A protein has these predicted regions:
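Eukaryote-skewed repeat-based solenoidal scaffolds used as protein-protein interaction platforms
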Residues: 2-158
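C-terminal structured domains
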Residues: 139, 163-171
Length: 171
């Protein structure tokens, strides 16, 4: 009997054993919080890694680790278990306009690039109208020869359209 697992972060039901996935998944982001004990964030990271392992072993899917952290103390363990990884994912959503979050994201990028010797690419979930700030944040990775990929997504496209409409209103 095939196993079923409801993957709410993807809004779909995956039945393993019947299909071979040729897709890439980014591991879920079980939001880490800055105002809780560190063990809770470590547990959330572990849950995300468990789902990634399940997708990889049971569904034959390639799962890209999502790097998440709440504060500087989380940077200690964000690369645990990832030494042989060549691709990771970051989100800049909500971190561009806040100086503290922006600086923390920049430190996280540096930590990941320095800690993962086999890293070749970073996929960035970004919702800004242009990639100017993201390019600055990931400039350290680019300087080390890491390919930084910032694909379009629905929210980014919506923000681009809204910014063009706002520009046209004032033209």
């Amino acid at each position: 009997m095939p196993r079923k697992l409801k993957l709410s972060f993807l809004n779909l039901t995956v039945t393993c054993g019947m299909w071979v996935f040729k897709k890439y998944f980014i591991s879920p982001d079980y939001s880490v919080c800055g105002d809780v004990h560190n063990y809770r964030n470590y547990h959330r990271l572990g849950r995300a890694r468990e789902v990634a392992i399940w997708l990889t072993t049971e569904c034959n899917a390639m799962t890209i680790p999502n790097i998440s952290y709440a504060n500087e103390r989380d940077l200690i363990y964000i690369t645990d278990g990832l030494k042989n990884i060549s691709i990771v994912a970051f989100s800049t959503k909500g971190k561009i306009n806040d100086k503290i979050d922006y600086d923390l994201l920049t430190k996280a990028v540096k930590k990941v690039v320095d800690d993962l010797p086999k890293l070749k690419a970073i996929i960035v979930y970004d919702v800004t109208v242009n990639n100017k700030q993201s390019n600055l944040i990931f400039s350290y990775a680019k300087s080390k020869g890491i390919n930084v990929i910032i694909p379009n997504n629905m929210l980014k496209n919506r923000n681009i359209i809204c910014s063009q409409q706002n520009t046209n209103e004032y033209a």
